[in-house]
Regions:
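A short helix->loop->beta-strand "cap" motif at the edges of active sites that frequently abuts
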Residues: 132-137, 190
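Serine-esterase "nucleophile elbow" of acetyl-processing enzymes
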Residues: 1-76, 89-98
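Structural motif
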Residues: 80-88
Length: 239
């Protein structure tokens, strides 16, 4: 990808080339959310830990490969975010920074909030807006959500949320949304970093993927964020 070429050139000559910027537009996983808990007022809140989010790991990898190249990360993830909201805030949260590349990752919340046609329309709008501004794009599919209600979830309000999330996963709804999204990306020559398929491979090989979720709902553990990072590096070098 052009962004890899820019990193390589910056690494060779730190004075002649500008710093590289990569934006990440997505939901809670992109923002860096992990465990959840019940607040004093009965609401549900999440633990924020962006230092262990996948884009932080990606930066570490790229800094290892191109140690002299300045790399700026733009975290445009918002907990609870959907593709529709991403399109609405793309100017404020992404384009104003003129990134060289943007990784787009939506789907987890979309299945519970919007129909598939709205999801497809919003993603199409995001892709078109980025491409119009000359920003390289990668569409990254998310992790799997829970395939059972974990015994680790004790609070009834969180278990209730988990039931809806579980249904969207085991019914095949999330997979349906992501297949549609991948087709849109391919039609626009946008590389797809298909992490969802890797999670499905783990499940089909007997791995309890629900145990790989920090909140046992839809946020991957800190260690599993490395899967996103390494997968993105592969995508960046292979396209």
């Amino acid at each position: 990808m052009e962004t890899i070429r820019k990193l390589s050139e910056k690494n060779r000559d730190i004075n002649a080339k500008p710093a590289v910027a990569i934006a990440f537009l997505g939901d809670s996983v992109t923002q860096g959310c992990f465990e959840v808990y019940t607040t004093e007022t009965g609401g549900i809140e999440t633990v924020f830990d962006a230092e262990n989010a996948y884009h932080t790991h990606l930066r570490k990898i790229l800094n290892t490969l191109f140690p002299a190249a300045a790399l700026n990360i733009i975290n445009a993830g918002i907990s609870g975010g959907c593709a529709r909201g991403g399109l609405e805030r793309i100017e404020r949260d992404v384009l104003r920074y003129s990134p060289d590349m943007c990784v787009v990752c939506f789907g987890l919340n979309d299945t519970g909030n919007y129909g598939i046609e709205e999801y497809k329309a919003a993603l199409t709008g995001i892709f078109d807006r980025l491409l119009k501004e000359g920003v390289e794009v990668i569409f990254m599919t998310p992790n799997m959500m829970c395939t059972k209600i974990s015994c680790h979830i004790k609070e009834e309000n969180i278990r209730k949320v988990g039931e809806d999330i579980l249904n969207n996963q085991v019914s095949g709804k999330l997979g349906q949304y992501l297949e549609a999204a991948k087709k849109i990306a391919v039609s626009k020559n946008i590389p797809v970093c298909d992490c969802y398929s890797k999670w499905k491979t783990l499940e089909n090989s007997g791995v309890d993927t629900t145990e790989l979720l920090a909140n046992h709902l839809n946020h991957p553990t800190r260690d599993m964020n490395w899967l996103f990072a390494y997968s993105l590096v592969e995508t960046m070098f292979e396209n």
